[in-house]
Each structure stands twice: as structure tokens, then as C-alpha cells.
Amino acid sequence: MKSYAIIQTGSKQYQVSEGDIIDVELLDGVSEGQEIVFDQVLFTFDGSKVSLGTPTVKNAVVKGELLSRVRGEKVIAYKYKRRKNYHRKIGHRQNYLRVKISNLVM
């Protein structure tokens, strides 16, 4: 089986393997092409051995490369009050970082 890890970043958890491309919440102080290290590894599987962290796995890191900054799909919030001619339409697009996972160190 293929090795994978579960990491936590931006209050979300992602299951990643080498070569995966994921969109994560914005991180401070990173630029395109720069290496990103995710040190909050909650779970690892290397094909035969399972490591479960309490809360994180010791000495396990996931390294990735920042590919680009992307924006998510537009979310529309619409509210109105009937018979009062009141309505508001608000749109929001979340900013993300697109990261390619390059290495799992277990």
C-alpha cells in the first residue's frame, strides 16, 4: 500500500501522500516556490507500520512546495425581509495556497 499521513493546518485536516496537490488556508511569510514544512502530523502509515500521535507523531514532518495562490469558488449570502423591500446580496471568495507534497518524513 501507498504511504500517507494526516496533517493539520489552518484548523483543518488533510490526508496527503507524496505528489499530492492540496489547497490549504493562507500561511504567513511564504512565497511561490518556497518549501513549506507541516509539523503537525497526526497519523502516519508507511505501508506496514501505523503511527498514531497523541496529539502529534514525534519526529514526523511533511514537506511541500508552494505552487501558487488561488481563490476558491464564490459563495453567495442573500438575506431579505418580505414585504419591506429589504434585501442584501453578499459574495465571498476565500484565498488558498496550492501546495504540492514533496516528501513524507516519518
UniProtKB/Swiss-Prot annotation:
<comment type="similarity">
    <text>Belongs to the bacterial ribosomal protein bL21 family.</text>
</comment>
<dbReference type="Pfam" id="PF00829">
    <property type="entry name" value="Ribosomal_L21p"/>
</dbReference>
<dbReference type="GO" id="GO:0003735">
    <property type="term" value="F:structural constituent of ribosome"/>
</dbReference>
<dbReference type="GO" id="GO:0006412">
    <property type="term" value="P:translation"/>
</dbReference>
<keyword id="KW-0689">Ribosomal protein</keyword>
<keyword id="KW-0699">rRNA-binding</keyword>
<dbReference type="InterPro" id="IPR036164">
    <property type="entry name" value="bL21-like_sf"/>
</dbReference>
<keyword id="KW-0687">Ribonucleoprotein</keyword>
<comment type="subunit">
    <text>Part of the 50S ribosomal subunit. Contacts protein L20.</text>
</comment>
<keyword id="KW-0694">RNA-binding</keyword>
<dbReference type="GO" id="GO:0019843">
    <property type="term" value="F:rRNA binding"/>
</dbReference>
<dbReference type="GO" id="GO:0005737">
    <property type="term" value="C:cytoplasm"/>
</dbReference>
<comment type="function">
    <text>This protein binds to 23S rRNA in the presence of protein L20.</text>
</comment>
<dbReference type="InterPro" id="IPR028909">
    <property type="entry name" value="bL21-like"/>
</dbReference>
<dbReference type="InterPro" id="IPR001787">
    <property type="entry name" value="Ribosomal_bL21"/>
</dbReference>
<dbReference type="GO" id="GO:0005840">
    <property type="term" value="C:ribosome"/>
</dbReference>
<dbReference type="InterPro" id="IPR018258">
    <property type="entry name" value="Ribosomal_bL21_CS"/>
</dbReference>
<dbReference type="GO" id="GO:1990904">
    <property type="term" value="C:ribonucleoprotein complex"/>
</dbReference>
<protein>
    <recommendedName>
        <fullName>Large ribosomal subunit protein bL21</fullName>
    </recommendedName>
</protein>
